[in-house]
Curated annotation (Swiss-Prot):
Gene: iolD
Organism ancestry: Bacteria, Bacillati, Bacillota, Clostridia, Eubacteriales
Entry protein name: 3D-(3,5/4)-trihydroxycyclohexane-1,2-dione hydrolase
GO cellular component: acetolactate synthase complex
Annotated family: Belongs to the TPP enzyme family.
Cofactor: binding comment: Binds 1 Mg(2+) ion per subunit.
SUPFAM superfamilies, alphabetized: DHS-like NAD/FAD-binding domain, Thiamin diphosphate-binding fold (THDP-binding)
Length: 644
């Protein structure tokens, strides 16, 4: 047996260079590169290996461990999970910073390989710098925190353990049904130790992503169920995008006259203008999708996890005869809502069912309901896109909470921009193939309803974990995947303040991204949530502490985000009118460096809900009668929702 005597870290890098995936006969390099933030836990091991021989791996210097890992996740998501970046950090706080990103990847079923440094396997210098000592178990380190949020976790305590660890890492990373974060903890002493690795460990490996076919019995059962139903509705989930099943879904929808609503992950698999596309569904959905869903007698979930936002906490589907059919590569997700399960690749499952349904001459009983629902929504969309602030008697979309804050904001920031008006303008101003990105706050809800993608895969929303701070980091990852397109991060002031470190990386690397920063001086989405459930405005607006009351009810906090970003070397714009917005967008397209457009947005001018409900933890008892009333409303809605 031929062997190669190299360090554990060198073997790791050599192995990563030999990983490929194959889908539909086309081969892709699986590990495109690695994001690094070096510390004592990885610089002399992985760092040395990368300096000496990185192979084809592109090495990027991150500026926050969570940020760089979120960039890696966005790259994999935009690449339909066919390529990934690895991420390496030091021990302790550097590793802990990646835990949030690991959860983001796992919640969304997106592959990311995390390689945190670890304490010494020998324990000779214990406690090493940044080590957490647990007196009841000395084998525990910070990296054990990854176990709860990883799809596969391992620690390489001896060089020879690297082989089985990495074989299993690739097994999970390339498994469409079970992918997510993979964490391989690497003790810093082991990284530098040499071992005679067998040559065959480094052979080229092609991981074939199989299009798992459905069973014959599952197809027969699915066809019989659909034939019994008159008004089915398809839910287009993220699996449609990752399976590249958009054309199959369109054919299925057309053949049988079945409309579909989109989840956040599924949106833009098919362009907005397609006649049977009802748009966003669920808590953040529009009136077209939600009204059809309410009366549907069969819900066909394709590649969806049926989250609470998709099902309105299982309240959305009100037809007494409604049943569920799932087409999903994951048996776990396919098993939800007592559904009839078709465990299959989305594309193959749709095509196989369609062939049999067509042979039996099936068609839904929809007449003009679909067209009417879409027309009504388009009227509402037009209204939303044309809402303008008038100083007198202006009623915001989210009315009755703290209407006076709108006037206060207008006077303080000299801006009359409403959020829906700005989104309407952006719909027209951005290039058709531009990619918009979001994750948290009120923007995902608004975008799910009102964004009208003109091209496929141009809507990139992380709403499985809805991680504040994903937005800017993700823009870099998306740009790495789609270098020829303009990339726009739509982010609120709250999320931007939490994390925007990889904006610096974009500048250093010459990877232009565009930040559209919606500043409404607070956590506006959560302010809406608390006030719509009876609370007052409490610690969700960005205000100075009032010296008289001792509370956070002083003047609004004014932040010049454009000035701050200018110091990074970003091209910036300040926007408080539609004309300035139009200029900023057009001028930003001419720039070669990253841009930030600081848009001052009137509070409470985001969209409201449409025939939706969300189950949240309202207090069962309060001195506030409004909260007691909100609790009663919750109980009434729960009575109409499925129990599981």
């Amino acid at each position: 047996m031929e062997t190669i005597k190299i360090t554990t870290a060198q073997a790791l890098i050599k192995f990563l260079n030999q990983q490929y995936v194959e889908l539909d006969g086309q081969e892709y390099r699986f590990v495109q590169g690695i994001f690094t933030i070096f510390g004592h836990g990885n610089v002399l091991g992985i760092g040395q290996a990368l300096e000496e021989d990185p192979g084809h791996l592109e090495v990027y210097q991150g500026h926050n461990e969570q940020g760089m890992a979120q960039s890696a996740i966005a790259f994999a998501k935009q690449s339909n999970r066919k390529q990934i970046y690895a991420c390496t950090s030091s021990v302790g706080p550097g590793a802990a910073n990646m835990v949030t990103a690991a959860a983001t990847a796992t919640a969304n079923n997106i592959p990311v390989l995390l390689l945190p440094g670890d304490t010494f396997s020998t324990r000779q210098p214990d406690p090493v710098l940044q080590q957490v000592e647990q007196t009841y178990n000395l084998s525990i380190t910070t990296n054990d925190a990854f176990k709860a949020v990883s799809k596969y976790w391992d620690r390489v305590n001896r060089p020879e353990q690297l082989m089985t660890a990495m074989i299993n890492a690739m097994r999970v990373l390339t498994d469409p049904a079970n992918t997510g974060a993979v964490t391989i903890a690497l003790p810093q002493d082991v990284q530098g130790e040499i071992y005679d690795f067998p040559e065959y460990f480094f052979k080229k490996r092609v991981h074939r992503i199989e299009r798992t076919p459905p069973s014959k019995q599952a197809i027969e059962d699915a066809v019989e169920l659909i034939k019994r139903k008159k008004k089915p509705l398809i839910i287009c989930g993220g699996g449609v995008r990752y399976s590249e099943a958009a054309e199959s879904l369109k054919r299925f929808s057309e053949k049988f006259n079945i409309p579909f609503g989109e989840t956040q992950a599924g949106k833009s698999a098919i362009e907005w203008s397609y006649g049977l596309n009802l748009g966003g569904i669920g808590v953040t959905g529009n009136s077209a999708a939600n009204s059809i869903a309410k009366d549907a007698d069969l819900i066909i979930g394709v590649g969806t996890r049926f989250t609470d936002f998709t099902t309105c906490s299982k309240f959305l589907f009100q037809n007494d005869d409604v049943e569920f059919l799932t087409i999903n590569i994951s048996s776990f997700h396919a098993n939800k809502l007592d559904a009839l399960k078709v465990i299959s690749d989305a594309k193959v499952g749709l095509d196989t069912i369609a062939n049999e349904l067509e042979r039996q001459g099936y068609s839904s009983d929809y007449e003009d309901e679909i067209k009417k629902a879409k027309n009504e929504w388009e009227k509402e969309l037009n209204r939303l896109f044309n809402i303008e602030y008038t100083e007198k008697e202006f009623v915001p979309e989210i009315a009755g909470h703290c209407d006076k804050v709108v006037e206060e904001f207008y006077k303080e920031f000299d801006s009359c921009l409403t959020q829906t008006k700005v989104l309407g303008e952006l719909n027209e101003l951005l290039d058709d193939d531009a990619i918009v990105i979001g994750a948290s706050g009120s923007l995902p809800g608004d975008l799910h309803k009102v964004w009208c993608p003109k091209r496929s895969n141009t809507y990139h929303m992380e709403y499985g974990y809805s991680c504040m701070g994903y937005e800017v980091s993700a823009a870099l990852g998306v740009k790495l995947a789609e270098e020829d397109k303009e990339v726009y991060s739509l982010v609120g002031d709250g999320a931007y303040l939490m994390l925007h470190s990889e904006l610096i990386t974009s500048i250093k690397e010459g990877k232009k991204i565009n930040i559209l920063l919606f500043d409404n001086a607070g956590f506006g989405c959560i302010n809406n949530l608390q006030m719509s459930n009876g609370m007052g405005s409490f610690a969700t607006e960005f205000r100075h502490r009032n010296s008289e009351t001792g509370k956070l009810d002083g003047k609004l906090l004014k932040i010049d985000f454009a000035k701050s970003a200018e110091g990074y070397g970003v091209k910036t714009y300040k926007v408080n009118t539609i004309d300035k917005l139009r200029y900023a967008i057009e001028d930003s397209k001419k720039q070669k460096i990253s841009t930030l457009i600081d848009i001052k947005i009137l509070p409470k001018t985001m969209t409201r809900g449409y025939e939706s409900w969300w189950h949240v933890g309202v207090s069962e008892k309060s001195k506030n009668p409004k909260i007691n009333k909100a609790y009663e409303s919750k109980i009434n809605h729960l009575a109409k929702a499925r129990k599981y």
